[in-house]
Amino acid sequence: MNIVLVGLMGSGKTAVGRLLAERLGRPFVDTDRLVEADAGRTVADIFAAEGEEGFRRREAEVVARAAAGDNQVIATGGGAVLRTENREALRRTGFVIWLDAEPETLYDRARGQGLHRRPLLSGPDPLGRLRALAAARRPFYAQAAHVRICTDRRSLQDVVAEIMEKLQERGERG
């Protein structure tokens, strides 16, 4: 069974996913990086050339491929849950964990990584945009996830430890 991390940009999917995969001795898959590798362009460049819909089409293909694998830790793009087929494939083949945080925390993290890498936050009010994205996507994350973990003011190690506890509760051994 895969372990799948969903959540908004800045929630910790990639950083937590890498550490979790290392602890479990499993491969780590980042769907945004797979989309970039397939396209030969960055996510920002794909958004600029093809728009969000073009990116989401590419993302759906990658999510289907990733979900078809087994025993991986998968970090999805923040909007992967918007498509029904993605939510269904991820839930069917994995234990889906929603990494959640307050919009202010997400904004601080995204800003630290460079807002230019986040096409959905371009514009005059990135924090306001992030608040709107959080409100709009919350129902999709809730529908996709088996469990929700808050990452506000927590270390990567602490979040990974909580995930390990959740896996043990489910009888998963990693």
UniProtKB/Swiss-Prot annotation:
Family under the similarity heading: Belongs to the shikimate kinase family.
Superkingdom of origin: Bacteria
Keywords: Amino-acid biosynthesis, Aromatic amino acid biosynthesis, ATP-binding, Cytoplasm, Kinase, Magnesium, Metal-binding, Nucleotide-binding, Transferase
Protein name: Shikimate kinase
Gene that specifies this protein: aroK
Chain residues that bind ATP: 10-15, 118, 154
Function in brief: Catalyzes the specific phosphorylation of the 3-hydroxyl group of shikimic acid using ATP as a cosubstrate.
Any single biological process term in GO: chorismate biosynthetic process
